[in-house]
Amino acid sequence: IRDRSYLTNHLVRQYWEQGSHILLVDTGNSYQGLCSLIHAKTKGRDGVYFTYTEEAPIAFNPFYVEDGVYDVEKRESLKTLLLTLWKRESEEPTRSEEVALSNAVNLYLSKLRTDRSIVPSFDTFYEFVETDYRRLLEQKRVREKDFDLENFLNVLEPYYKGGEYDYLLNSDKQLDLLDKRFIVFELDNISSNRTLLPVVTLIIMETFISKMRRLKGVRKMILIEECWKALTSANMSSYIRYLCAPVQAA
């Protein structure tokens, strides 16, 4: 295994030096050294390493994009993320719930464009739903059985400031991964965590698909190493299938 890891490190480094975009999903810290080397070599501009520890838990901001472009893929991924947080794995959302969440995301993104004082984050999205979107639902007389706002806010409250997972979707690093060419997601410490794993997997897939769609004429590579345990649920396997379609097409 050590020889295979050494060979893979060598190949991955060669691809990176040739200008490829590389996303690695790993357990076992096989690429930490190479990622640190690239981070140092590029003076911090590249080589992004995501891992989870109690002292420094993994954190993202899926609502932030550097160029301000929220394309159809990005909007869809935000809606899917919210549904993943809200619904149990075996619980299918209704059509009206999907429509309500799509509307909430679109209206929130419109507000970001008109009010530059709002910092894109899960917290400001949650506050928007709790106030502006609530008023809109009341005006439209949307029935609770079509979209249960109180249930949605209650289930997602742990991800809002002061909640158990408030760090997860509110990173203040303002990091857009689109232009980062070497990214490692180390999943060892969360591979059994049924709350964190679906969210992190979604962000991994969205990151790579965004590169596939938006970076033309550039080689992209995703390498899923020794972490099948983290990807065996029905939820995760569907994302792998979703990922494979555009990758094969490319």
Give residue spans per PLM region.
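P-loop NTPase motor domains
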Residues: 1, 29-45, 54-249
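Helix C-cap/helix->beta junction micro-motif
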Residues: 18, 249-250
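Glycine-rich phosphate-binding P-loop
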Residues: 1-11
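Post-Walker A helix-loop "phosphate-sensing" segment adjacent to the P-loop in P-loop NTPases
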Residues: 13-23, 42-45
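Short, basic/hydrophobic alpha-helical segments
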Residues: 11-14, 212
